[in-house]
Regions:
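Glycine-rich, acidic/polar active-site loops that bind/position phosphate-bearing ligands
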Residues: 1-276
Length: 276
């Protein structure tokens, strides 16, 4: 953490995660086969290119610190079968800087307690979901990456989002692909969290694809003439219902637990079959 802070990463948290395996003790009391899963989060960058540079630099620094202490580190998505893999949840947002210097979050609605997102915000998430099958090869491109995306380990398997049951109750659904992060008292914090990347995802390509897909959805939302309520209705549609932009035969929003409340057959029918 100190090494990352020195380089301007501004680490916000570092803690043990649910992965890892129990260590062993030999006959003389020595501990061996120690394997823990750790999480590090650092402050976002307003420049997507700088954010990708930071991710690459952090990986190099972490590996070097471990090496100096006689330890090994793995950034594989699924280094050990049967336990939780390693993800790299990627947060993306959209803001505008006015001539006055004021920054406005373009995803946030005018009233945080009466709506989830702005028109641009709905277009953003709809674009990512509608185009995710084209994005996915740039996110999960290896067998190791797909091995992580399995039910039972809080890793996403369906192209679906969660907004929350009510605008005043932010979502805490950890079973979806893209989450909406909101702070009712801080509209500038409104952003999306993509939960499928792993530490070896090429973040340069991933972020580029995300914003291109988002732009496609934003163009639809803005040019459709629909307001936030109508766009929310399309995002929340049921499978089989017609839509102006999203596919007819699938759903894109779920406030239930995708793993616990659906069988695999139901998930495939409602949200589409996953690529893995």
């Amino acid at each position: 953490i100190e090494e990352l802070d020195i380089r301007g990463m501004h680490v916000e948290m570092g803690h043990k995660e649910v992965g890892g395996i129990k260590p062993k003790i030999d006959d003389v009391g020595h501990v061996f086969d120690v394997c823990e899963q750790l999480e590090l989060d650092w402050l976002f960058s307003s420049n997507p290119l700088q954010a990708a540079d930071n991710e690459l630099e952090a990986r190099i620094i972490i590996r070097e610190v471990f090496r100096r202490n006689g330890l090994d580190v793995s950034f594989k998505a699924k280094p050990i079968l049967g336990v939780a893999g390693s993800g790299e949840h990627t947060h993306v947002g959209l803001a505008a800087r006015l001539k006055s210097g004021k920054i406005i979050n373009l995803l946030a609605p005018e009233d945080m307690k009466s709506d989830y997102l702005s028109t641009i915000g709905y277009g953003f998430i709809m674009g990512v979901l509608h185009n995710y099958e084209a994005i996915n090869p740039f996110i999960s491109s290896t067998t190791d990456a797909f091995n992580r995306l399995k039910p039972g380990f809080e890793a996403p398997v369906c192209i679906v989002t969660s907004l929350g049951h009510k605008p005043e109750l932010p979502s805490r659904n950890r079973s979806i692909l893209v989450g909406l992060i909101r702070d009712l008292e801080n509209p500038k914090a409104t952003r999306f969290e993509l939960r499928s990347p792993n530490p070896f995802t090429n973040i340069y390509l991933a972020v580029s694809c995300l914003y291109l897909a988002a732009l496609d959805g934003i163009k639809y939302a803005v040019n459709s003439g629909r307001g936030p309520k109508e766009l929310l209705g399309e995002l929340s549609k049921r499978a089989g219902e017609d839509a102006g932009y999203l596919e007819k035969d699938r759903e894109y929003r779920c406030e239930k637990n995708v793993f616990e409340d659906y069988t695999q057959e139901e998930r495939d029918a409602v949200f589409g079959k996953p690529p893995a």
